[in-house]
Amino acid sequence: MEKINVLVVGNGGREHALVWKLAQSPWAKHIFVAPGNGGFSKLENVTSVPIGSSPSDFGSLVDFATKHNVGLVIPGPEQPLVDGITTWFQKAGIPVFGPSAKAARMEGSKTFSKDFMKKHNIPTARYENFTDYEAAKQYIANSSHNLVIKASGIAAGKGVLIPANKQEAYEAIKEIMVNKQFGSAGDEVVIEEFLEGDELSILCISDGYSFVDLPPAQDHKRIGDGDTGLNTGGMGAYSPAPIGTPSLLEKIRKNILKPTIDGMRKDGYPMVGCLFVGVMVTPDGDPKVLEYNVRFGDPETQTVLPLLKSDLLELMLATVEHRLDSVDFQVHADKYSTTVVVAAGGYPESYRKGDEITVKEPLPENTFIFHAGTKEENGKVVTAGGRVIAATAIADTLEEAVKKAYVGVDHISFKDKYNRTDIAHRAFKEKPKNKVSLTYEDAGVSVDAGNQLVEKIKKSVKSTKRPGADSEIGGFGGLFDLQRAGYTDINNTLLVAATDGVGTKLRVAQIMDIHNTVGIDLVAMNVNDLVVQGAEPLMFLDYFATAHLDIKVAADFVEGVADGCKLSGCALVGGETSEMPGMYAPGHYDTNGTAVGAVLKENILPKKDKMNAGDVLLGIASDGVHSNGFSLIRKIIETTDYSYTDPAPWNPKSTIGEEVLIPTRIYVKQLLPATRRGLILGLAHITGGGLVENIPRAIPDNLSAEVDMTTWNVPEIFKWLGKTGGVPINDILKTLNMGIGMVAIVKPENVEEVIKVLKEAGETVYTIGKLVERKDLPGCTIKNSEDLY
């Protein structure tokens, strides 16, 4: 990774906090801010650029970024995103951390976002959208619950009105729709049910597929202490908010964040950037969406970024490259943060500008000042907006963070400054005198869910019963009786074990919400590694780990494992389902499996001492890409214009995601008869490394495998992946199976019989090459691959 220049667009406190955090990255060469404010001059390697952020400025911004070799652009405010700034830079080949104009409609149009929530079953308040004033009046007249009235467009954070009664509601819609209080932003309004409870701000970074969420924050919108007075852009925030318990956050991730990210992608406008979700936590503990924003919040950004342990620039680059899940995301889980905004006297109504600001140095440790409505004038920093500046502090406790933030406020001086004195007051509500006990579920682990899963999968597990094992689960392990399985000559019997996982194919399964096929993959990756040693799979154990157990997902996965066990003739005798809050991103899980088999000593493969030049290589067809090479496959799909839900170009009746999720073929029952008859000298399971690296594992060092690619029809999926990704042919041959899932090494005189046995078992078999003397050759040579695609 090379150092890059970064351009941040905006001039507020949010942008100051972003630049402050980005400047800590070793990968930041220089940071430009357009237009910036009075606080940037003290930061090293940071330059303010006098270019605005309106559509008329987009061309100048692109020219500047091109001239200064900018490697990443970060628009801060919402309006440029709604106006399509992302497309301008992308057309110039410059990556942008921020969504397209289509995706920005989630903030730019409240009617659009409410309809999106309805379509994707995302919990929110009951609502109706109106463009007709009289129809809106009639809806209010017929309503029996308290209402919230929202101008659909962007109204500088002030377009939400909460009337106390119907008369105020009538006045509100008249002001918005008739008198145009918010201009064209009020051409359409949303009238929705008033929700009661505690608000929570969730900042979620997403690459369109994966997402990570920053610690939950609470904002303070009202100008006065005790949440009184007029609405503002935000007078302070604190994080993590105590109401954001592990179990609540898992609900938010599962019911709100994941459906939103998935829904936006499936609807054709993926969220690439920061999705800021305003959530209301109702008295019964259910989170509901109040609104979406498509950028970092203000002042929440000033609050949560000091809690971020990871490199922000690295996170953003991974986001725009659609590989967010490759970055280690960490926060300071043992710290609290508080931000207090200092405003000009008279804000949010009329206020004076041009007053000199001074900040007494040095600031207390872990206390930071973020400028917003400031500018440099004649060598001095002066007020230039309503919300002028903010003090943020982090500490080991919330109480200490609040105190330190107010000490920071005391270091700020300008005429008629104003700030609230009760930031974080909701966190300090009088606590019950009786000590509240914590349960395992409060910590994010549901024992009941685990028990429900066991009951749900018992039937599937039982269906894998075979001689030697009863496939009962719920005990401390699995037992197997070798003699009942037919291995009566114990002294001549060896046990063989294999362990493997599925790799990043799991991410595609999670994106597509298809989980049973990767269960089959898990079994296949293990039992195929047993059969290449001549062994019969006898029993299987699986491991499934996630942050929060989704019973349906886990059950689908285990049912797939059971299907794989039945296909290979082994018993599913046990496993482990591990729920580990904080260890995995929302919706993510990992898995591993172990298979144990048996083989008579005379049947052990490979029989390298019996192999000679001239022995024949038989290729047994794969069912697709199987389970290897998915880091490359995902990169090809996710960095092009294709989506997993698009029709597959090589098979339009199926989606790309469904095609690549076709499970690994299991070759056990088809191969064992021939191996036990001594017809096969060796087998190579074609996994990571492709034909080039796997066949040599099954042959002696004095021989080389010579494979001719004209001997079978390479499936179109492999050609499409190679061509679309611009993958060098030598690389794809070392990564994917190219349509051959298993290779058998056979004496020439046995070829006809082996092909017959395999075809009778339903396999497609090709004679793909032979063994030759090694001499100076590599372990495997692929001929006639030049015109593959």
Curated annotation (Swiss-Prot):
Residues annotated to bind ATP: 140-201
EC number: 6.3.4.13, 6.3.3.1
GO CC, alphabetical: cytosol
Cell location: Cytoplasm, Cytosol
Catalysed reactions listed for this entry: 2-formamido-N(1)-(5-O-phospho-beta-D-ribosyl)acetamidine + ATP = 5-amino-1-(5-phospho-beta-D-ribosyl)imidazole + ADP + phosphate + H(+); 5-phospho-beta-D-ribosylamine + glycine + ATP = N(1)-(5-phospho-beta-D-ribosyl)glycinamide + ADP + phosphate + H(+)
Keyword Ribosomal protein attributed: no
Chain residue ranges for the region called GARS: 1-428
Cofactor binding note from Swiss-Prot or TrEMBL: Binds two magnesium or manganese ions per subunit.
Name of one Pfam family that matches: AIRS
UniProt cross-references to PANTHER family, sorted A to Z: TRIFUNCTIONAL PURINE BIOSYNTHETIC PROTEIN ADENOSINE-3, TRIFUNCTIONAL PURINE BIOSYNTHETIC PROTEIN ADENOSINE-3-RELATED
Known role: Catalyzes the second and fifth step in the 'de novo' purine biosynthesis pathway; contains phosphoribosylamine--glycine ligase (GARS) and phosphoribosylformylglycinamidine cyclo-ligase (AIRS) activities.
Record-given protein name: Bifunctional purine biosynthetic protein PUR2,5
